[in-house]
Every structure is written in structure tokens, then in C-alpha cells.
Amino acid sequence: MVLKFLPGMKILPMDNNKLEQQMRDLEYFHSLRLLPGSWVIIRVDGRGFSQFTKSHFKKPFDVEFHKLMVQTAAALLEELHGIYSYTESDEISVLFPPSWDLFDRSLEKIVSISASIASATFTHAFQTVVNFDSRVWLGVNQSQIIDYFCWRQANARRCALNGWCYWMLRKLGETARKATTLLDSQSFAFKIDLLLQNGIDFNELPTWQHRGVGLYWEEYQKTGYNPLEAKEVLVIRRRIKVDDQLPTQDEYSEFIRSFLNLESNQPKNGHLSEQ
């Protein structure tokens, strides 16, 4: 259809302010904020990592992939000013205190930026484009936080056991379908015994494979220089500690509890990781 303008016809100017407001009003989720006073956990997961890891890394575990995930977890902990970061398999969970107010607790920004940090860090380190998705979990008390991380560690153990059993069967010549069928609905004890029969002691495997890895801030002393007094002095700095020997069960619960009273010591802005 061709529009024809008659002589003398006036084209009314568009009200830019009105249009601006109309468009802003359609950003339905922009005003969403995380509940004030709640503990926050951001969890990022690798998108399509089942196929990605199958074609780029050894199975069931690959040290290079493990290091990439730890590097990504450290970037999230530092960039977003978290308290504790935990990674297992292709996921990372980062804990933030109730006082955390980065991005004014905007849900859209938290989800998009956390996914971006994870994707960019892994991609830059591995030189292959990958994507992470992100979600937000909220807790109202310390017990829920402890339960969350115990839940994720239990998932790490389950996935590690299933992974070792599956790939052992595949190496023995079973098809993907047959290996899955043989393990379906089998008990934890059955799978442990299956590995033992084939020379693999699950409990002797590297701890990070079945308990995950924790990252958190630690203080250390560093020699500095005081120009006013013209002498060297000892100063306290903080850096990220990578813990691949995490405890489990009740000891892990107490380990997590130890981080939950550190809110006042967390950075409000800037980067505190200093090697």
C-alpha cells in the first residue's frame, strides 16, 4: 500500500516522551528486585555441555575442564563480590549475604551479567565459544543456605558415581542405551560394587570429583612499603582460596556455616583478589 499525502496535510510530530514511556512500560520485568534481607545464591549452568564436553574432554572427568570451571567460579566470586563459590560438574553456585546490593538487586541484571561473566571467562580461557544460563535462588535463613549446598554436594556425588559407572560400561563395549538401562534404578551400593569389581574404588578417586570444589576469601600477610615512614611494613590482603578437599555431610554443613557470619567483611565494590 502506498501512502499519499494531500496538499496541506500536516504530519503531527511524535511525542518522544510519550513513546519512551510506552516502550519502558513494556519492559515488564525490569523493576523486579530480589527480596530485601534474603540470602542470594546465583547458579550458572553450562548450556549444551553434555555434547560439548563429550567432544572436547576426557570422560568421565577431565582435569582441564575441572580447571576451567574453577577459573570461571573464581571470576564470578570476584566480579560479583560473593562470599563462597561452589562448582561441581558443569554448574557453579555463588553465595551472597542479605546486605548484598550490587545492581540494586535487579533480577534482570543479576541473571544476565552472571551468565555473561561465566560465558566470557570460560570462552576466553578455552578459546571456544560456550554459553551459560543463570538463575537465582533465595533463602531466608542460614539453615536453608546449608541445605542448599549440601543438596548440591549430594548431586555432585550422585553424578560422579553415575558418570564413572556409565563410562566404565561404555569402555567395556556396552552401547549408550544398554549402559543407561543397566544403571537405571540401581542402588548406590550396587554402583559402588560395580566399580569395585572393575578395579575402581569410588572413595579413592580425587575428592573434587565427588565432593566438588569450594572457593572463598582468605587473608594473608604481604610485605608493603610505607612511604611516610620510609620502611617496609606487613599488610593484610585477601585472595581467593581454591579448596578441592572439601569435607562432606555434617562437617560440610559446619564448613558452610562458617561463611554465614562474614557479611560485614565482604567487599562492597572493587576487586580484592591479590596474588
Label for each model-derived stretch:
Residues 3-275:
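Regulatory and interdomain segments flanking nucleotide-handling catalytic cores
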